[in-house]
Amino acid sequence: MNNLRKKVLMMTMAAVTLSAIAQQPVDYVNPIIGTNGMGHTFPGACTPFGWVQLSPDTDTIPHNINGAYQKNAYEYCAGYQYRDKTIVGFSHTHLSGTGHSDLGDILLMPAVGDVKLNPGRADYPEEGYRSRFDHATEKAVPGYYEVILDDYGIKAQLTATQRTGIHKYTFPKGKDGHLILDLVHGIYNYDGKVLWANLRVENDTLLTGYRITNGWARTNYTYFAISLSQPIKDYGYKDKEKVLYNGFWRRFKLEKNFPEITGRKIVAYFNFDTANNSELVVKVALSAVSTEGAIKNLHAEASGKSFEQLAEAARTDWNSELKHFEIEGTPDQKAMFYTSLYHTMI
C-alpha cells in the first residue's frame, strides 16, 4: 500500500512539474505564425530587441528583372515563405512585419559533395548550393531553430545572442563538408545592391570582413567576425563580377587560399574535415563600427560558451520579457497573444 501511495505521489509531482513548465509564456510562442503569404515574419533565432535575426532564407525575388519592376518581390520581406520547398541558406539580419524588404546579410550554407557557388533555382536546386527541406523536420521556438537539409543530410541548428548568430551543423558521418559564405545574397536584391565587400582569413578558425549595401538604409555597413570550431582545410572564392583588369598575379591564383579579397560579388567556400568530426559550430558576430568591434562582440557574448548554453540563455531572455504579461484564456488564445507579443520585440 505504501508503495502505491509513493507511486501516486511521484506521478502527481511529475504532472505538476510538467504543467508548470508548459505554462511558461515562452512555450506558447509559435514563430511559424505569419510566415506564409504577406505576413512578413521569419521563423529563425533571435533575442528580444537583438540586432541579429538568424533565420533561413527560402528564396528572394529581385527588385527588377531586365529593368522591369517585380511586384512579387515584397513576398520575401522577411526572406522566408512557408510554402517554399527549399532553403537557400541562413542569413543574420531580417525585418519582421514590415511592408518593405531589405537586409539578409552574411549568408552561410553548409553542404557536402561538389562545391557550388551559386544558389540555384527553387525548381532545380541541384544546380546550386540550396537544399530541399521538409516542415516535418523543422522546429522553431523563441531563440532556437532547427531543420534537416535533405539534399545533404545535414542537421542545422541556430540560436542567437544580441549581436551574435550561432550555427551548429551536424554533417553525415564519413563525409567531408564545406561552408558557403555568400556576400552577394540579400533580401529585395538587385544588381548593384552590394557596393563593396571584404573577406579576410585571420587564421584557420577566424574570418573577418564587411559588406556595404544600398537598400532601405543607404550605405549600410555590416562588419562581421566568424569563429569556427574546426580548422579550415582549404578554401577559395569566386568573384561573380566581370573585372576588366585583375592585376599582375604572376604564378599564383588568388581564387584559392587567399589572405584577403575585396569586390562586389564575392562568394567563398571553406572545406572541413567533417568525416572525422561531424559537428561544426560557427559563431558570427556583427558590428556597425568595425571588424574589431565584431571580434569584441564575439568574445563578450559567445566565446567559451557551448551552443546549448547559448540556446538556453536565449530562451530565458525571451521568457523574462514575455512573463511581464499574464493573461487568462485557452491555449490557442495564449498562443495568439504571446506570439503577437513576441513579434513586437523583434
Model-predicted segments: where are they?
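Bacterial Sec-dependent N-terminal signal peptides
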Residues: 1-23
